[in-house]
Amino acid sequence: MKIPLITEIQRFSLQDGPGIRTTIFLKGCPLRCPWCHNPETQDARQEFYFYPDRCVGCGRCVAVCPAETSRLVRNSDGRTIVQIDRTNCQRCMRCVAACLTEARAIVGQHMSVDEILREALSDSAFYRNSGGGVTISGGDPLYFPDFTRQLASELHARGVHVAIETSCFPKQGKVVESMIGIVDLFIVDLKTLDAHKHLDVIGWPLAPILANLETLFAAGAKVRIHIPVIPGFNDSHADIDAYAEYLGKHAAAISGIDLLNFHCYGEGKYTFLGRAGSYQYSGVDETPAEKIVPLAQALKARGLAVTIGGIVGIANGKNELTGDIALEVHH
Protein backbone atom coordinates (compact mmCIF):
# COMPACT_ATOMS: atom_id res chain seq x y z
CA MET A 1 0.00 0.00 0.00
CA LYS A 2 1.32 3.41 -0.99
CA ILE A 3 1.24 5.51 2.18
CA PRO A 4 1.07 9.31 1.85
CA LEU A 5 2.73 11.96 3.90
CA ILE A 6 0.37 14.31 5.73
CA THR A 7 0.90 18.04 5.28
CA GLU A 8 -1.75 19.18 7.74
CA ILE A 9 -4.68 18.08 9.86
CA GLN A 10 -7.01 21.05 10.04
CA ARG A 11 -9.57 20.89 12.83
CA PHE A 12 -12.80 22.87 13.06
CA SER A 13 -12.98 23.48 9.32
CA LEU A 14 -16.22 24.97 7.99
CA GLN A 15 -15.40 25.01 4.27
CA ASP A 16 -14.70 21.39 3.32
CA GLY A 17 -18.15 19.89 3.56
CA PRO A 18 -21.18 20.13 5.86
CA GLY A 19 -20.89 21.00 9.52
CA ILE A 20 -17.74 21.22 11.62
CA ARG A 21 -15.06 19.03 10.08
CA THR A 22 -11.52 17.81 10.38
CA THR A 23 -9.70 17.99 7.05
CA ILE A 24 -6.78 15.65 6.37
CA PHE A 25 -4.39 16.93 3.70
CA LEU A 26 -2.48 14.17 1.90
CA LYS A 27 0.71 15.06 0.04
CA GLY A 28 0.70 14.07 -3.62
CA CYS A 29 -1.22 15.00 -6.77
CA PRO A 30 -0.60 14.14 -10.45
CA LEU A 31 -2.21 17.36 -11.71
CA ARG A 32 -0.23 20.57 -12.01
CA CYS A 33 -2.74 23.41 -11.88
CA PRO A 34 -0.66 26.59 -12.27
CA TRP A 35 -2.92 28.50 -9.84
CA CYS A 36 -2.73 25.85 -7.08
CA HIS A 37 -2.80 27.50 -3.65
CA ASN A 38 -1.48 24.39 -1.90
CA PRO A 39 1.71 23.65 -3.87
CA GLU A 40 3.16 21.82 -0.89
CA THR A 41 0.66 19.01 -1.57
CA GLN A 42 1.73 18.41 -5.20
CA ASP A 43 5.00 16.50 -4.77
CA ALA A 44 4.43 13.28 -2.81
CA ARG A 45 7.94 13.45 -1.38
CA GLN A 46 9.00 15.27 1.76
CA GLU A 47 10.11 18.87 1.25
CA PHE A 48 11.08 21.80 3.42
CA TYR A 49 10.01 25.41 3.68
CA PHE A 50 12.74 28.02 3.97
CA TYR A 51 11.80 31.29 5.69
CA PRO A 52 14.62 33.73 4.84
CA ASP A 53 13.48 36.36 7.35
CA ARG A 54 14.23 33.93 10.18
CA CYS A 55 17.68 32.97 8.91
CA VAL A 56 20.63 34.50 10.80
CA GLY A 57 23.30 33.13 8.46
CA CYS A 58 24.94 30.96 11.11
CA GLY A 59 25.91 28.28 8.58
CA ARG A 60 24.78 25.26 10.61
CA CYS A 61 22.67 24.03 7.67
CA VAL A 62 25.65 24.40 5.33
CA ALA A 63 27.83 22.29 7.60
CA VAL A 64 25.45 19.31 7.82
CA CYS A 65 24.22 19.10 4.19
CA PRO A 66 25.72 16.02 2.46
CA ALA A 67 24.79 17.35 -1.00
CA GLU A 68 26.17 20.86 -0.49
CA THR A 69 22.88 22.43 -1.53
CA SER A 70 23.35 25.44 0.77
CA ARG A 71 26.11 28.02 0.88
CA LEU A 72 26.75 31.28 2.68
CA VAL A 73 26.91 34.49 0.63
CA ARG A 74 26.78 38.20 1.35
CA ASN A 75 23.82 40.15 0.05
CA SER A 76 23.81 43.74 -1.20
CA ASP A 77 23.71 45.24 2.29
CA GLY A 78 26.62 43.11 3.49
CA ARG A 79 24.56 40.66 5.54
CA THR A 80 25.46 36.97 5.46
CA ILE A 81 22.62 34.89 4.08
CA VAL A 82 22.06 31.31 2.95
CA GLN A 83 21.64 30.57 -0.74
CA ILE A 84 19.94 27.27 -1.57
CA ASP A 85 20.07 25.16 -4.73
CA ARG A 86 17.61 22.29 -4.26
CA THR A 87 18.56 20.47 -7.46
CA ASN A 88 20.60 17.80 -5.68
CA CYS A 89 18.72 17.83 -2.38
CA GLN A 90 18.62 14.34 -0.84
CA ARG A 91 15.65 15.24 1.38
CA CYS A 92 17.50 14.02 4.46
CA MET A 93 16.22 17.02 6.44
CA ARG A 94 19.45 17.36 8.41
CA CYS A 95 19.40 21.08 7.65
CA VAL A 96 15.99 21.39 9.30
CA ALA A 97 17.19 19.63 12.42
CA ALA A 98 20.32 21.80 12.57
CA CYS A 99 18.50 25.14 12.28
CA LEU A 100 18.17 26.91 15.63
CA THR A 101 15.90 29.72 14.43
CA GLU A 102 13.22 27.60 12.72
CA ALA A 103 14.09 29.11 9.37
CA ARG A 104 13.41 25.68 7.86
CA ALA A 105 10.40 23.45 8.40
CA ILE A 106 9.60 19.96 7.15
CA VAL A 107 6.59 19.70 4.83
CA GLY A 108 4.97 16.27 5.06
CA GLN A 109 4.84 14.05 8.14
CA HIS A 110 4.57 10.28 8.39
CA MET A 111 1.31 9.23 10.06
CA SER A 112 -0.45 5.88 10.20
CA VAL A 113 -4.19 5.40 9.74
CA ASP A 114 -4.48 4.74 13.49
CA GLU A 115 -2.68 7.98 14.35
CA ILE A 116 -4.95 9.97 12.05
CA LEU A 117 -8.02 8.27 13.49
CA ARG A 118 -7.03 9.14 17.04
CA GLU A 119 -6.75 12.80 16.16
CA ALA A 120 -9.84 12.95 13.97
CA LEU A 121 -12.09 11.08 16.39
CA SER A 122 -11.21 13.42 19.25
CA ASP A 123 -13.74 15.86 17.78
CA SER A 124 -16.56 13.36 17.30
CA ALA A 125 -18.89 15.36 19.54
CA PHE A 126 -18.55 18.38 17.26
CA TYR A 127 -19.33 16.23 14.21
CA ARG A 128 -22.47 14.83 15.82
CA ASN A 129 -23.77 18.18 17.00
CA SER A 130 -23.11 20.03 13.74
CA GLY A 131 -23.74 17.36 11.11
CA GLY A 132 -20.04 17.43 10.30
CA GLY A 133 -17.35 14.82 9.88
CA VAL A 134 -13.97 14.23 8.28
CA THR A 135 -12.83 15.36 4.84
CA ILE A 136 -9.88 13.65 3.17
CA SER A 137 -8.22 16.16 0.89
CA GLY A 138 -4.85 16.86 -0.64
CA GLY A 139 -3.20 16.84 -3.01
CA ASP A 140 -5.64 14.21 -4.16
CA PRO A 141 -6.68 11.32 -1.91
CA LEU A 142 -7.25 9.07 -4.94
CA TYR A 143 -3.49 9.25 -5.56
CA PHE A 144 -3.34 6.91 -2.55
CA PRO A 145 -6.45 4.77 -3.09
CA ASP A 146 -5.68 1.93 -0.67
CA PHE A 147 -4.77 4.29 2.16
CA THR A 148 -7.78 6.50 1.50
CA ARG A 149 -10.09 3.49 1.31
CA GLN A 150 -8.79 2.15 4.63
CA LEU A 151 -9.07 5.51 6.38
CA ALA A 152 -12.55 6.16 4.98
CA SER A 153 -13.70 2.66 5.94
CA GLU A 154 -12.49 3.05 9.52
CA LEU A 155 -14.24 6.39 9.86
CA HIS A 156 -17.40 5.15 8.17
CA ALA A 157 -17.53 2.13 10.49
CA ARG A 158 -17.51 4.52 13.45
CA GLY A 159 -20.44 6.50 12.10
CA VAL A 160 -18.38 9.49 10.99
CA HIS A 161 -19.50 11.32 7.85
CA VAL A 162 -16.71 11.02 5.28
CA ALA A 163 -16.06 13.38 2.37
CA ILE A 164 -13.20 13.35 -0.08
CA GLU A 165 -11.98 16.25 -2.22
CA THR A 166 -10.71 14.95 -5.54
CA SER A 167 -10.35 15.73 -9.22
CA CYS A 168 -11.52 12.17 -10.02
CA PHE A 169 -8.37 11.76 -12.12
CA PRO A 170 -7.67 7.96 -12.05
CA LYS A 171 -7.56 6.32 -15.44
CA GLN A 172 -8.64 3.05 -13.81
CA GLY A 173 -12.35 3.44 -13.12
CA LYS A 174 -12.31 0.80 -10.39
CA VAL A 175 -10.45 3.22 -8.10
CA VAL A 176 -13.45 5.54 -7.90
CA GLU A 177 -15.91 2.66 -7.85
CA SER A 178 -14.17 1.21 -4.80
CA MET A 179 -14.92 4.38 -2.81
CA ILE A 180 -18.68 4.25 -3.36
CA GLY A 181 -20.44 3.13 -0.21
CA ILE A 182 -17.72 4.20 2.21
CA VAL A 183 -17.52 7.85 1.14
CA ASP A 184 -20.61 9.88 1.97
CA LEU A 185 -19.77 12.91 -0.15
CA PHE A 186 -17.55 13.31 -3.20
CA ILE A 187 -16.40 16.91 -3.65
CA VAL A 188 -15.11 16.95 -7.21
CA ASP A 189 -13.00 19.71 -8.72
CA LEU A 190 -14.02 20.34 -12.33
CA LYS A 191 -11.48 22.81 -13.62
CA THR A 192 -12.53 23.01 -17.27
CA LEU A 193 -14.57 21.09 -19.84
CA ASP A 194 -12.13 21.95 -22.62
CA ALA A 195 -10.14 18.75 -23.19
CA HIS A 196 -7.24 20.53 -24.90
CA LYS A 197 -6.83 23.08 -22.12
CA HIS A 198 -7.12 20.39 -19.48
CA LEU A 199 -4.25 18.42 -20.98
CA ASP A 200 -2.08 21.36 -22.04
CA VAL A 201 -2.41 23.48 -18.90
CA ILE A 202 -3.13 20.99 -16.13
CA GLY A 203 -1.17 18.10 -17.59
CA TRP A 204 -3.89 15.45 -17.36
CA PRO A 205 -6.59 14.22 -19.78
CA LEU A 206 -10.18 15.23 -19.15
CA ALA A 207 -11.78 11.99 -20.39
CA PRO A 208 -11.11 9.81 -17.30
CA ILE A 209 -12.32 12.59 -15.02
CA LEU A 210 -15.68 12.79 -16.79
CA ALA A 211 -15.94 9.00 -16.95
CA ASN A 212 -15.38 8.74 -13.20
CA LEU A 213 -17.79 11.56 -12.50
CA GLU A 214 -20.47 9.85 -14.54
CA THR A 215 -19.79 6.60 -12.68
CA LEU A 216 -20.59 8.43 -9.46
CA PHE A 217 -23.74 9.93 -10.99
CA ALA A 218 -24.95 6.53 -12.19
CA ALA A 219 -24.31 4.95 -8.80
CA GLY A 220 -26.35 7.56 -6.99
CA ALA A 221 -23.37 8.76 -4.96
CA LYS A 222 -23.67 12.18 -3.38
CA VAL A 223 -21.58 14.57 -5.48
CA ARG A 224 -20.80 18.23 -5.04
CA ILE A 225 -18.89 20.08 -7.76
CA HIS A 226 -16.19 22.67 -7.12
CA ILE A 227 -15.35 25.02 -9.98
CA PRO A 228 -12.37 27.31 -9.40
CA VAL A 229 -13.07 30.33 -11.63
CA ILE A 230 -9.63 31.27 -12.97
CA PRO A 231 -9.05 34.53 -14.89
CA GLY A 232 -8.26 33.83 -18.52
CA PHE A 233 -8.57 30.07 -18.14
CA ASN A 234 -12.20 29.05 -17.63
CA ASP A 235 -14.17 32.28 -17.32
CA SER A 236 -15.19 32.93 -20.94
CA HIS A 237 -18.70 32.77 -22.39
CA ALA A 238 -17.76 29.48 -24.05
CA ASP A 239 -16.72 28.06 -20.69
CA ILE A 240 -19.97 29.18 -19.09
CA ASP A 241 -21.99 27.54 -21.86
CA ALA A 242 -20.00 24.30 -21.58
CA TYR A 243 -20.43 24.07 -17.81
CA ALA A 244 -24.14 24.86 -18.00
CA GLU A 245 -24.78 22.30 -20.74
CA TYR A 246 -22.79 19.45 -19.19
CA LEU A 247 -23.76 19.93 -15.56
CA GLY A 248 -27.34 20.76 -16.48
CA LYS A 249 -27.69 17.29 -18.02
CA HIS A 250 -26.74 15.79 -14.67
CA ALA A 251 -28.55 18.27 -12.41
CA ALA A 252 -30.57 15.56 -10.66
CA ALA A 253 -27.38 13.78 -9.60
CA ILE A 254 -25.53 16.85 -8.27
CA SER A 255 -26.20 18.04 -4.74
CA GLY A 256 -24.69 21.46 -5.37
CA ILE A 257 -22.01 23.50 -7.12
CA ASP A 258 -19.53 25.82 -5.45
CA LEU A 259 -17.92 28.52 -7.58
CA LEU A 260 -14.57 29.41 -6.04
CA ASN A 261 -12.97 32.72 -6.87
CA PHE A 262 -9.27 32.76 -7.72
CA HIS A 263 -6.83 34.28 -5.23
CA CYS A 264 -3.06 34.52 -4.77
CA TYR A 265 -3.00 33.54 -1.10
CA GLY A 266 -0.72 30.57 -1.77
CA GLU A 267 1.94 32.53 -3.66
CA GLY A 268 4.26 32.75 -0.68
CA LYS A 269 4.37 28.97 -0.39
CA TYR A 270 6.04 28.72 -3.79
CA THR A 271 8.81 30.99 -2.55
CA PHE A 272 9.22 29.04 0.69
CA LEU A 273 9.46 25.80 -1.33
CA GLY A 274 12.10 27.26 -3.64
CA ARG A 275 9.69 27.41 -6.58
CA ALA A 276 9.01 31.14 -6.83
CA GLY A 277 9.62 31.20 -10.59
CA SER A 278 7.01 28.50 -11.24
CA TYR A 279 4.02 30.52 -10.03
CA GLN A 280 2.33 32.03 -13.08
CA TYR A 281 -0.37 34.12 -11.40
CA SER A 282 1.69 36.62 -9.43
CA GLY A 283 -0.08 39.98 -9.43
CA VAL A 284 -3.29 38.60 -10.95
CA ASP A 285 -6.38 40.07 -9.28
CA GLU A 286 -9.06 37.95 -7.66
CA THR A 287 -11.83 36.81 -9.97
CA PRO A 288 -14.24 39.74 -10.39
CA ALA A 289 -17.91 39.24 -9.62
CA GLU A 290 -18.90 39.98 -13.23
CA LYS A 291 -17.07 36.80 -14.25
CA ILE A 292 -18.65 34.59 -11.59
CA VAL A 293 -22.25 35.77 -11.41
CA PRO A 294 -23.09 34.91 -15.08
CA LEU A 295 -21.84 31.36 -14.53
CA ALA A 296 -23.89 31.11 -11.33
CA GLN A 297 -26.97 32.35 -13.14
CA ALA A 298 -26.48 29.94 -16.05
CA LEU A 299 -26.14 26.98 -13.69
CA LYS A 300 -29.06 28.06 -11.55
CA ALA A 301 -31.20 28.33 -14.68
CA ARG A 302 -30.46 24.65 -15.30
CA GLY A 303 -31.91 23.72 -11.92
CA LEU A 304 -28.62 23.48 -10.04
CA ALA A 305 -28.04 24.72 -6.49
CA VAL A 306 -25.13 27.17 -6.62
CA THR A 307 -22.96 28.88 -4.05
CA ILE A 308 -20.34 31.55 -4.61
CA GLY A 309 -17.45 31.39 -2.18
CA GLY A 310 -16.03 34.60 -0.81
CA ILE A 311 -17.26 37.08 -3.41
CA VAL A 312 -21.02 37.54 -3.31
CA GLY A 313 -22.97 37.97 -0.09
CA ILE A 314 -26.64 37.54 0.68
CA ALA A 315 -28.62 40.16 2.54
CA ASN A 316 -32.28 39.32 3.20
CA GLY A 317 -32.30 36.88 0.31
CA LYS A 318 -30.95 39.41 -2.18
CA ASN A 319 -27.61 39.27 -3.93
CA GLU A 320 -25.56 42.21 -2.67
CA LEU A 321 -23.88 42.83 -6.02
CA THR A 322 -26.59 42.19 -8.58
CA GLY A 323 -29.76 42.52 -6.54
CA ASP A 324 -31.57 40.08 -8.80
CA ILE A 325 -30.56 36.52 -7.94
CA ALA A 326 -30.53 34.94 -4.52
CA LEU A 327 -27.68 32.48 -4.22
CA GLU A 328 -26.54 30.54 -1.20
CA VAL A 329 -23.09 31.82 -0.36
CA HIS A 330 -20.14 30.49 1.63
CA HIS A 331 -17.69 32.97 3.11
From Swiss-Prot:
S-adenosyl-L-methionine binds at residues 35-37, 139, 189-191, 263. Binds 3 [4Fe-4S] clusters. One cluster is coordinated with 3 cysteines and an exchangeable S-adenosyl-L-methionine. [4Fe-4S] cluster 1 binds at residues 29, 33, 36. It comes from the Bacteria. Its cofactor is [4Fe-4S] cluster. Its EC number is 1.97.1.-. It catalyses: glycyl-[protein] + reduced [flavodoxin] + S-adenosyl-L-methionine = glycin-2-yl radical-[protein] + semiquinone [flavodoxin] + 5'-deoxyadenosine + L-methionine + H(+). [4Fe-4S] cluster 2 binds at residues 55, 58, 61, 99. Residues 15-315 form the Radical SAM core domain. Pfam families: Fer4_12 (PF13353), Fer4_7 (PF12838), Radical_SAM (PF04055). InterPro entries: 4Fe4S_Fe-S-bd, 4Fe4S_Fe_S_CS, Aldolase_TIM, Benzylsuc_synthase_activase, Benzylsucc_Synthase_activating, Organic_radical-activating, Organic_radical_activase, Radical_activat_CS. Pathway: Xenobiotic degradation; toluene degradation [regulation]. One of its GO terms (molecular function) is metal ion binding. Signal peptide: none annotated. The keyword Metal-binding applies. It is an enzyme of class 1 (oxidoreductase). Activation of benzylsuccinate synthase under anaerobic conditions by generation of an organic free radical, using S-adenosylmethionine and reduced flavodoxin as cosubstrates to produce 5'-deoxy-adenosine. NCBIfam families: PFLE_PFLC, rSAM_BssD. Belongs to the organic radical-activating enzymes family. This is Benzylsuccinate synthase activating enzyme. It comes from Thauera aromatica. The lineage of its organism: Bacteria, Pseudomonadati, Pseudomonadota, Betaproteobacteria, Rhodocyclales.
